[in-house]
Amino acid sequence: MLSKFSKYIMIGICLIFSGKSFSQSDQLLQDLGYLIDDALFFSDKYITPATDAAVYQSSSGWVYSAKKRKLWDVTVGVNTNFFFVPNSDREFQIKNSDFQLLSIESGATSATVPTAIGNGDQIYLAGDLDGEPIRIETPKGINQNVVIYPHLSGALSLWYGTEVLVKYSPRVNLKRSEYQVYGFGIKHNLSQYFKSLEANKINLAATATYSNEDVSFDFLDIQTDFGNLGINRLSGLVDTYQMQLNASKEYKKIEVLAGFIANVSDFKYKLTGTKGAIEETIPLQYILNQRLKEIYKTKANFMGEISGRYQISKIFIQSTIAFGKFVNSNLSVQYEF
């Protein structure tokens, strides 16, 4: 963590290189440093459960089938994803001792507030910025038990039992938030090397994928005598690298799959809303985005997956459930060319 002195130096340097004039007092620079620390603390607690959830939403439903397909077979799927929001990640507790500038307005020493995937409850935080009072309403969560979003997927069969996989979701507007995912991968059939497995209609496949998730939420709308502070939109950017093993058994027109998923995700955070009026004096959004690097993180996840796929001519209906820390379900309707 930066020392207090280093934080003020950072603000001062940004002022100089932004070409802005400033006559702000030392007290303002100190208070802004404290406010940045408070925003950083709250950002981490608020958005991390949502980015954890985004990994689950992007991780399941990659594999249509574990069996070896014919060269140049193409499958296109229209998917609806259902993420079940767990109670344990819907809220977190804050205490006055967590903050340097702000405090809970009601006079309480602690309070429970929603995460980005929590409910719509709000409280007020208050403080003084260079002697002028500020009042902040904590952000709401999406207030949904199940998050539903659509996405497209596809698979192209190449040589030697290898397939190229793609997944794409347009930017979906959820309640007080937006979500987008895209990714690609490679699947290779392993059971082709074991004739006894193929003879019994048992299939094995290994898959490697990459996906990028972008989740954005309404954040802190802070009005001050210096203008809006421009930290009203917070985004989580997640890069996920995944390995997956699947086994399946065919029963006439039904294929039942079971899989094991292991992935590693890099989490980054960024303020992406419209810059506030304070930017005419202090490049606050830039400073905060630099400080948000302090809460970047890398996490590993391990999850199971079960799936059932039913064929109706060239149309396939598939239901998938992935489970681990969270539970995520995907319903897919596919057409095979």
Regions found by a protein language model. Give the residues of each.
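Bacterial Sec-dependent N-terminal signal peptides
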Residues: 1-28
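Outer-membrane beta-barrel biogenesis signature
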Residues: 23-124, 199
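Short loop/turn motifs that connect adjacent beta-strands in outer-membrane beta-barrel proteins
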Residues: 64-72, 87, 176, 191-204, ...
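Residues on the lipid-exposed face of transmembrane beta-strands in outer-membrane beta-barrel proteins
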Residues: 65-67, 76-78, 152-158, 184-190, ...
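Residues that define the transmembrane beta-barrel architecture of outer-membrane proteins
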Residues: 70-72, 145-150, 178-184, 200, ...
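Transmembrane beta-strands of outer-membrane beta-barrel pores
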Residues: 80-84, 168-172, 190, 208-214, ...
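Extracellular/periplasm-exposed beta-strand and loop segments of Gram-negative cell-envelope proteins
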Residues: 89-91, 128-144, 173-179, 212-240, ...
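Repeated loop/turn-to-beta-strand initiation elements of outer-membrane beta-barrel proteins
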Residues: 160-164, 193-196, 253-256, 312-319, ...
